[in-house]
Amino acid sequence: MTYQQPDAKGFYGKFGGQFVPETLMTAVIELDKAYREAKEDSSFQAELDDLLKNYVGRETPLYHAKRLTDHIGGAQIYLKREDLNHTGAHKINNALGQVLLAKRMGKKKIIAETGAGQHGVATATAAALFDMDCTIYMGEEDVKRQALNVFRMELLGAKVFSVTDGSRVLKDAVNAALRAWVAGIDDTHYIMGSALGPAPFPEIVRDFQSVIGREVKRQYAEISGGKLPDAVMACIGGGSNAIGMFYPFVNDKSVAMYGAEASGLGLDTEKHAATFAKGRPGILHGALMDVLQDAHGQIMEAFSISAGLDYPGVGPEHCYFNEIGRATYDSITDEEALEGFKLLSRLEGIIPALESSHAIALAQKVAAKMSPDQSLIVCLSGRGDKDVMQVKERFEAEAEGK
């Protein structure tokens, strides 16, 4: 049976939907209508394709990581090089698509949330390109962790609003951005950065990010004589790079799909972001999905060395994949991710983002159990420039025995 999700109400099985206040329903309905029309408009897709090719630099390479493969001694590992996109990560695929959509809707202002800053930079970039007013909401903790990306956003002409509510991280930035959207509904478009939020956001983000998996499918077929890979893998916070990798393979049952979520200091602590391992269904940011919550249903704080993965929920389509067993999700600790960060740097000369390092760490475990005639494709979602100082300080502190 061909996979057809979401349904007309924006649900993936029991997950997703539109759990938003009445004040936002108008905007959500308007967005849904505009998106359906844009999807059917070949000129919209042609403009986006042109930007992806000539501005972003797509298609990105599918690179055979031979030294990493030899080191692990299992499956042939290929890296989908989303780190080579303009702005350094997969986030630009979605940001450009949504700014084009906002322009089509006649909106003049763009707002967005960001954690690691990559979505903020991508959104500020797209807004600069189309001469649109841009405000980025970012948790105060992330503003400190990602000072370089904050400067990049400001350099691109965006205003960065430091959010001091709650735990001052990504979920609080989403709350602030949603509030700002309510206040400026007539002239403002909110660009959700991950496959989260009320319908149609998870579907929009999935569709714009699916360029990743579509390219992989074509590229791998070219080098393998028309075959499909045995497995695909990506890190998962909200889940946009993972859904972009997975979705084009969802009907190919022979292709295993793996997501690497962040278990921070460990699943036996409260310092993690392992929603599938430790969460349960609840409503957050306008959708029903698996979330980290306490016994009273209060959303718990997520924790990860990676600013892009410390979100206490996972997008609804991933929740559905997890429930029906279509994808397998495993958790990776900070320490394992740091080892992955070092390993890829030293073996392949590629410094990955800390988010992507979680996928590299999981790839070591999964590839080792596979045979050399099998293939595993890992989405290298972003480059590690933004994380180098943070990792440097961490290694120095460890060397001093702190």
UniProtKB/Swiss-Prot annotation:
Belongs to the TrpB family. Pathway: Amino-acid biosynthesis; L-tryptophan biosynthesis; L-tryptophan from chorismate: step 5/5. NCBIfam families: trpB. One of its GO terms (molecular function) is tryptophan synthase activity. It holds the Pfam family PALP. Its EC number is 4.2.1.20. It is an enzyme of class 4 (lyase). Keywords: Amino-acid biosynthesis, Aromatic amino acid biosynthesis, Lyase, Pyridoxal phosphate, Tryptophan biosynthesis. Tetramer of two alpha and two beta chains. Disulfide bonds: none annotated. SUPFAM superfamilies: Tryptophan synthase beta subunit-like PLP-dependent enzymes. The beta subunit is responsible for the synthesis of L-tryptophan from indole and L-serine. It catalyses: (1S,2R)-1-C-(indol-3-yl)glycerol 3-phosphate + L-serine = D-glyceraldehyde 3-phosphate + L-tryptophan + H2O. The modification N6-(pyridoxal phosphate)lysine is found at residue 91. Gene3D superfamilies: 3.40.50.1100. It comes from Streptococcus thermophilus (strain ATCC BAA-491 / LMD-9). This is Tryptophan synthase beta chain. Signal peptide: none annotated.
